[in-house]
């Protein structure tokens, strides 16, 4: 049982611990705040809370896996991403629908397909089911599909016709996907180029901390602003 405790100086284990606690705290925050905003925003905050809840549970398992094995919890991490990343993509769709944006189901399907391509090939590369760099390249194609859809596709065009506050939040969310998500391929490359699982896991943990929590905070900020004095 002693192996289940963090070893002093294990910075990777510490990063797993910090992210797991941050995810749990964020979940409580998002779910509580969802009770104080307009009804049309409650689903968005519920989804944000689900993202951090699922991530928090998986990080608890990933932390223990790392402490015991001192190796990358690939399966746990990708199971987490297969659940949470599609939920993040759903947020784009929900926000536009909440403000009456004209966006069809096709937009969501393209975001979903891009997400699955990105994750499935990323996992295949890291798990050794195909060439490491081939999996990386094919996964990047999925990311490119997502970027196109939220910038130049139907979702991006629907956001452009929305209110200024929605455009501001949507742009911030797009920047997270464009810039914040770039941390993930950096971690993927670091796992091979720098030859260490420590670098890969710390970078991945940092990316999840920034992208999942900050993503939800942007939605919360928009929901509170739009709710105004009606929030209670």
State the predicted function of each range:
Residues 1-23:
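Hydrophobic transmembrane alpha-helical segments in integral membrane proteins
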Residues 26-29, 91, 121, 142-164, ...:
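Alpha-helical transmembrane segments in multipass membrane proteins, preferentially the mid-helix core
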Residues 28-34, 63, 69, 78-111, ...:
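Internal transmembrane alpha-helix with an interfacial aromatic "cap," most often the third helix
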Residues 39-49, 103-109, 170-174:
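Membrane-interfacial loop-to-transmembrane alpha-helix junctions, especially the N-terminal start
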Residues 46-65:
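A generic, lipid-embedded transmembrane alpha helix
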């Amino acid at each position: 049982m002693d192996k289940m405790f963090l070893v002093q100086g294990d910075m990777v284990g510490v990063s797993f611990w910090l992210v797991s606690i941050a995810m749990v705290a964020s979940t409580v925050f998002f779910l509580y705040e969802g009770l104080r905003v307009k009804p049309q925003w409650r689903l968005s905050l519920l989804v944000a809370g689900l993202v951090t809840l699922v991530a928090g549970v998986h990080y608890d398992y990933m932390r223990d896996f790392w402490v015991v094995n001192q190796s990358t919890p690939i399966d746990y991490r990708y199971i987490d991403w297969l659940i949470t990343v599609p939920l993040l993509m759903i947020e784009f769709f929900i926000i536009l629908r909440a403000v009456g944006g004209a966006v069809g189901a096709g937009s969501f399907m393209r975001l979903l397909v891009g997400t699955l391509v990105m994750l499935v090939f990323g996992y295949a590369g890291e798990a050794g089911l195909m060439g490491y760099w081939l999996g990386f390249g094919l996964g990047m194609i999925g990311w490119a599909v997502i970027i196109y859809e939220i910038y130049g596709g139907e979702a991006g065009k629907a956001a452009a016709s929305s209110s200024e506050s929605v455009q501001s939040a949507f742009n911030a969310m797009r920047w997270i996907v464009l810039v914040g998500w770039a941390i993930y391929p950096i971690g993927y490359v670091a796992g091979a180029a720098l030859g260490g699982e420590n670098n890969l896991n710390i970078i991945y943990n940092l990316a999840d901390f920034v992208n999942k929590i900050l993503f939800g905070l942007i939605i919360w900020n928009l929901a509170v602003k739009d709710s105004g004095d009606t929030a209670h």
